[in-house]
Curated annotation (Swiss-Prot):
One of its GO terms (cellular component) is nucleus. A zinc finger (C2H2-type) spans 17-41, 47-70. Disulfide bonds: none annotated. It comes from Schizosaccharomyces pombe (strain 972 / ATCC 24843) (Fission yeast). GO terms for biological process: DNA-templated transcription; negative regulation of transcription by RNA polymerase II; positive regulation of transcription by RNA polymerase II; regulation of fungal-type cell wall organization; regulation of transcription by RNA polymerase II. InterPro entries: Transcription_factor_dom_fun (IPR007219), VerF-like (IPR051059), Znf_C2H2_sf (IPR036236), Znf_C2H2_type (IPR013087). CDD domains: fungal_TF_MHR (cd12148). This is Zinc finger protein klf1. It is found in: Nucleus; Cytoplasm, Cytoskeleton, Spindle. GO terms for molecular function: DNA-binding transcription activator activity, RNA polymerase II-specific; DNA-binding transcription factor activity, RNA polymerase II-specific; RNA polymerase II cis-regulatory region sequence-specific DNA binding; zinc ion binding. The keyword Disulfide bond does not apply. Disruption phenotype: Defective in supporting the G0 state, while normal under vegetative condition.
């Protein structure tokens, strides 16, 4: 037996191969190792497995993965089809799978166009942007309009036959150059086998091409002016001050009652919303066997209280996160885990301390129950994702610090599960049975549409939650924005339809535009976007904040790549993002505020505007570092203080601090300005209290670091509310007029701290309780 050759250890004087990436100092003894390391900088995982969406930097690794994980398993007879019903792209003429209701001519044209891109990976030494990138992306967007599982005709009101693709869906065009896509000609007619799983995050061909985030960002900016805009004169016209709402033209008032048709805020339950006695008995038995609840807690959970908590879910939570379809959901038939997620969320909003403690106890077991359920096995059922999303929002935004931290850990599990797609066995996607006629066909088509729209809403609201927690808590986003290349949500009145007849009457509404072109329009600021619903506007805002996070990443050279390839000046990319945020606010005013469609004090409006202000703040401030600095002050931790004080001092000396301070003043004034009283216990926007806390820290840090103190505006005056209003007025005047008035009052933040402590102290959310404790210690300094 021949002995294996023993490799010689590295010796001094041997050749070292250095990484060519700018700023990297690593070197390697072998050239291939240096090349492999270089790809980690460019994130060039251009080879995508069509079976499981795994990505690789080398084609040989992809081929080995496919042979070991998919081909051999298929040859052994373990599966008749690949796990996700996707076909390996090779040199042969194999076809990418499309839903059976998509015309074959569309499939062939889209496949031919995309295959030419997929087979050519983007290498590190090649330009990020190819000459035909924009054309290819637009073609991919056009393809998703046809091939996406959730897209269906709203103009075809017939109740028989198969679903057809309307002509307008084949060409997404809203009379704007940023939304135009090429049309696709018809050539053939074929039928494909039904899928075993349904994609949640877009379709396979689109994701296979649009897998590179850097390329996507380049596409967003490729039509911009070559010279970046300059910073505008400092003022408060981009804030949420009600006095500024007359800056935009007023549109005609809506002809329908927008609030009643789009926001179902009533807590009146119909029969299907009520838990029957038999279902209630089964629920109590499951809770007694699987959830560690005391006898007192089980006795407290009466049937009438359960129905009350369900009502609060629909009244307080659903209008903000409408991903459950109330018209078709029957609580008696809902899985226990989904029902418990709804009930516990209602327990939070009902305002009862004992009910809230029971909800926290239930969530210590609920997630485990979902993970061990047979329906969680990939591809999971739709209700699994719905229950997990409700659970994550409860645990992150209302529960204890421990559950908050665990929820962030399990967030990745949920997203990874979603990548595997949605099980088709629990969704109405199959063809209409031959023996089905009349009313049954109508109901079938309605439920079919509901399943598709519900799946799309899970994708978008998961993206919103993921993006929201980036700016709230500084977490790293786990959902790549390129994976939500989907048409936006349907009109909420259509989603709220509680019968097939009501749904049919609204089907002639316009189809929603695609997310990516709309996002690009807000970044270019050149054209007024199409009329969007409040929920779609919220999705766009979170898309903009995600782009800001991508551009702020270090050592990846994204901005340099964009400038090199299309000549756009992005050195001041923060100015571009700020301009897009302001354009979003102006558009929001035109759509909803100036015409009275939504009142300024509407809870949903207040939640969106708080997110807008925090988006500006997070663009210019490391919120986590600021929180850590405040914690180091009250804990006297030298290590924490040393690591954050340098950042805070540098931040204070930069222009970033002034921008953040302005928006913090806006935020506090929106909560506590004038005679306003804030009730945190009745707050339905779960993120808003945290926005107030962050804004308070920013204003405190500005005064404390500058002057070394925190004091009352008028010593001897114990009316904190009046002193707070005087402080806000002088800060606003001084900052907007570039005067020095605010320098005198900048350290007069003691009334602010006391007022914020008073309004936030009733909160039960563990993270906010810790924040109030820090503010209380800052008062005592």
């Amino acid at each position: 037996m021949t002995k294996a050759k023993k490799s010689r250890a590295y010796q001094e004087g041997d050749i070292r191969y250095k990484c060519d990436f700018q700023g990297c100092t690593k070197s390697f003894t072998r050239k291939e190792h240096a090349r492999r390391h270089f790809r980690s900088h460019t994130n060039s995982k251009a080879f995508i497995c069509p079976h499981c969406s795994s990505s690789f930097t080398r084609s040989d690794v992809l081929n080995r993965h496919v042979n070991q994980k998919h081909v051999k398993q298929n040859d052994a007879g373990s599966q008749t089809h690949p796990k996700h019903d996707k076909t390996l792209i090779s040199s042969s003429d194999q076809e990418l799978p499309f839903p059976s209701y998509v015309e074959a001519d569309v499939q062939d044209a889209a496949y031919t166009d995309l295959k030419s891109h997929i087979d050519q990976p983007i290498l590190p030494d090649q330009p990020i942007i190819s000459d035909n990138f924009n054309e290819g992306l637009q073609s991919a967007i056009a393809q998703t309009g046809n091939n996406y599982m959730f897209t269906t005709s709203r103009r075809n009101n017939s109740i028989s036959g198969s679903i057809t693709i309307p002509e307008s869906d084949q060409q997404i065009n809203l009379q704007n150059k940023f939304l135009s896509t090429p049309s696709i000609k018809n050539n053939a007619n074929k039928s494909l086998s039904p899928q075993d799983s349904i994609s949640i995050f877009g379709t396979s061909p689109f994701n296979a091409y649009q897998q590179n985030t850097d390329n996507f960002v380049c596409w967003l900016f490729d039509n911009m002016e070559k010279d970046a805009p300059t910073e505008s004169v400092s003022n408060f016209t981009d804030g949420i001050n009600a006095k500024q709402l007359n800056l935009m033209p007023v549109l005609d008032s809506p002809t329908i009652d927008f609030l009643s048709s789009h926001f179902r805020v009533d807590d009146k339950l119909v029969a299907k919303d009520l838990l029957s006695l038999s279902a209630y008995s089964s629920l109590i038995q499951v809770m007694n066997n699987n959830y560690q609840l005391s006898e007192e807690a089980l006795q407290y959970i009466t049937r009438s209280r359960v129905n009350l908590w369900i009502a609060h879910y629909w009244k307080d939570f659903h209008p903000r996160w409408p991903f459950l379809h109330r018209g078709t959901l029957k609580v008696d038939e809902a899985p226990v885990e989904l029902l418990l997620a709804m009930i516990t969320m209602g327990m939070h909003f009902v305002g009862d301390a004992f009910a809230y403690s029971i909800a926290v106890s239930i969530h210590s077991t609920l997630r485990f129950s979902i993970y061990t359920h047979p329906d969680f096995k990939p591809p999971a059922s739709l209700w699994v994702y719905q229950a997990l999303l409700i659970a994550e929002i409860f645990e992150k935004m209302t529960s204890t610090v421990e559950q908050h931290n665990l929820s962030q850990i399990f967030h990745g599990v949920t997203i990874e599960s979603m990548q595997n797609g949605l099980s088709s066995k629990d969704t109405v996607t199959e063809k209409i049975p031959k023996n089905m006629t009349g009313t049954n066909i109508a109901q079938h088509k309605w439920h079919q549409w509901v399943d598709r729209e519900a799946s799309k809403r899970i994708a978008f609201f998961s993206f919103v939650l993921d993006s929201q927690h980036v700016i709230l808590f500084g977490y790293r986003p786990l959902i790549d924005i390129t994976s939500v290349g989907l048409p936006l949500l349907c009109d909420e009145a259509l989603w709220n339809a509680d019968s097939y007849e009501a749904w049919t009457s609204l089907l002639n509404e316009n189809d929603p535009p695609h997310f990516f072109p709309v996002l690009k329009m807000f970044l270019t600021n050149e054209h007024l976007p199409p009329k969007l619903s409040p929920w779609n506007m919220m999705i766009v805002l979170h898309g903009l904040t995600t782009i800001g996070w991508i551009l702020s990443r270090e050592n990846l050279g994204i901005v340099e790549n964009i400038m090199q390839n299309n000549g756009t000046n992005l050195k001041n990319w923060r100015i571009l993002l700020k301009a897009s945020y302001k354009f979003w606010l102006r558009t929001y005013r035109v759509f909803f505020l100036n015409n009275g469609t939504l009142p300024l004090n509407h809870p949903y409006v207040r939640g969106c505007l708080a997110t807008y202000e925090l988006a500006h703040i997070s663009l210019h401030t490391n919120i986590v570092a600021l929180q850590t600095y405040a914690k180091s002050i009250v804990s006297t931790s030298r290590r924490l203080y040393a690591s954050t004080s340098r950042y805070v001092s540098a931040w204070l000396a930069s222009d970033d601090s002034e921008v953040s301070i302005k928006h913090a003043v806006d935020m506090v004034e929106a909560f506590l300005g004038g005679d306003m009283e804030y009730d945190v216990q009745n707050e339905t926007g779960l993120h808003r209290p945290w926005c107030l806390y962050v804004s308070t820290l920013i204003l405190w840090a500005y005064g404390y670091v500058s002057d070394g103190r925190c004091e009352m505006l008028e010593p001897g005056n114990n009316d904190c509310k009046s002193q707070l209003n005087a402080y806000l007025m002088q800060m606003r005047t001084g900052l907007s007029e570039k005067a020095k008035d605010h320098v005198y009052v900048r350290s007069k933040t003691l009334p602010l701290l006391k007022c914020v402590i008073d309004v936030l102290c009733p909160a039960r959310w563990g993270l906010l309780v810790d924040g109030v404790r820090i503010l209380s210690k800052l008062v005592q300094l």
